[in-house]
A protein has these predicted regions:
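Short loop/turn segments that connect beta-strands within beta-propeller blades
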Residues: 91-94, 131-134, 169-172, 215-217, ...
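Bacterial Sec signal peptide processing site at the extreme N-terminus
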Residues: 23-47
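Extracytoplasmic beta-rich repeat domains
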Residues: 36-42, 50-72, 99-115, 136-152, ...
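Loop/turn-rich, solvent-exposed surfaces of beta-rich toroidal or solenoidal domains
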Residues: 293-300, 308-342
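Bacterial N-terminal signal peptides that target proteins for export
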Residues: 2-16
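Structural signature of WD-repeat beta-propellers
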Residues: 82-83, 122-123, 160-161, 205-207, ...
């Protein structure tokens, strides 16, 4: 199999056809970073240098997660959801449930929150809003969603797979407006996209660009492209922006699928820089740098100001890395074998690791209080501290 064909099939495996079933590529196990195929055999882990001591602060169970889970974080609480309809609001300090609900639905996106209302999306294309463990309303969407709803300003904003943005009333789920930004692309990515607020502007990602929208009526304000659709077929032309993204003030950095990473001034709608990088997971970052893992498992750091490459770590090739998260002095990245790795921000060197279970780590969130909360595909939720 040629390298070009491997890249094309890897892109295809992460997409869905609009209005159709999930596209799967069988018989070619070398597509995935954690494949058992010899061509892409996961690199053996280096010896743990033990430069940080890692301990578990608390652990709890969520349920299997088979969709692109995005945590909803507000103050000291975190909203999480599982495929089986479990929705929970956790206290990030103790790990205890503030409340837990069980919906009679399979979930495909979640969990957005403003600290009071948690919003998720079901396989039946319903947005479900929950407060204190009780469903307060449901609202039907016209398309499947893989991106967690944004709950802000008394509204719930939803980005669906067909690149439509819908605004719902936070009190009753009534539809306020809908904006469709699809530009004829027949393929979409079965991963979480980009939606957030900067000041009085709603910002979403579609077709390689950030779009600023008036949240009151859905009218466009600006666009800032960090990638352009190129290629000889529909697969190669998919360049949607992917979660997670990195925000510092008005500057937001994101990855365009298998194309570039880049940063924009989200208040002005101005592109600051872009850099080529073939990857299928989002980014982390801090005031100094942006951190990401490419498709082959290299971890990179880019200067946040101008995009200059600061360092790369090739010690995790084909291990199925997720998007790095930034602590005060370290970055943290998870892999497909359930390991969470701590790296130096200065040069990317490995500092230590811990295994939370034997399933892929979906994400790890740096709380800002000296701990990292990691969630695995099998539903393990663990807070870890590195000293």
């Amino acid at each position: 199999m040629t390298v070009k064909l491997q890249h094309r099939l890897a892109r295809l495996a992460a997409m869905t056809l609009l209005g159709a079933t999930i596209v799967s590529v069988s018989g070619c196990s070398s597509l995935w970073p954690f494949s058992s195929d010899n061509a892409n055999k996961p690199m053996a882990l280096a010896a743990d240098p033990g430069r940080v001591q890692i301990r578990s602060l608390w652990s709890t169970r969520l349920g299997d997660v088979r969709f692109p889970l995005t945590p909803g974080v507000s103050a000291s609480s975190m909203a999480l959801a599982a495929t089986d309809g479990t929705v929970v609001l956790l206290d990030t300090t103790s790990g205890r449930d503030l409340w837990r609900a069980k919906l009679p639905d399979t979930l495909t996106a979640g969990a957005g929150t403003d600290g009071q209302t948690v919003a998720v999306v079901t396989q039946g294309n319903d947005v479900v809003a929950i407060q204190s463990g009780n469903v307060i309303w449901r609202s039907k969407l016209a398309s499947r969603a893989y991106t967690a709803p944004l709950v802000a300003g008394g509204r719930v904003f939803v980005l669906t797979a067909d690149r439509t943005v819908t605004a719902l009333d936070g009190k009753n789920g009534a539809r306020l407006w809908t904006q469709n930004r699809q530009q004829g692309e027949p393929l979409v990515i079965q991963q979480a996209g980009v939606i957030f607020a900067v000041g009085d502007t709603l910002v979403t990602g579609h077709s390689g660009r950030f779009s600023g929208i008036n949240p009151a009526n859905g009218s466009p304000r600006w666009e800032a492209p960090i990638a352009f659709a190129r290629g000889s077929n529909d697969i190669e032309r998919v360049v949607d922006l992917m979660a997670p993204f990195s925000r510092q003030g008005d500057v937001v950095c994101a990855r365009a699928y298998f194309s570039t990473v880049g940063c924009v001034d989200a208040r002005q709608g101005q592109v600051l820089w872009t850099s080529q990088s073939r990857g299928a997971v989002g980014l982390g970052g801090d005031a100094r740098a942006v951190y990401g893992a490419d498709q082959d498992g290299r971890v990179h750091a880019w200067n946040r100001r101008d995009g200059a490459r600061l360092w790369s770590n090739e010690g995790f090739m084909y291990r199925g890395l997720n998007a790095p998260a930034a602590e005060a002095t370290r970055i943290v990245v998870g892999d497909a074998s359930g390991y969470v790795h701590w790296l130096s921000k200065d040069n990317g060197a490995l500092l230590g690791r811990a295994q939370i279970d034997n399933s892929p780590v979906l994400f790890q969130f740096a709380t800002g209080a000296g701990s990292v909360i990691a969630v695995s595909r099998n539903g393990t939720v663990t807070a870890l501290s590195a000293q």
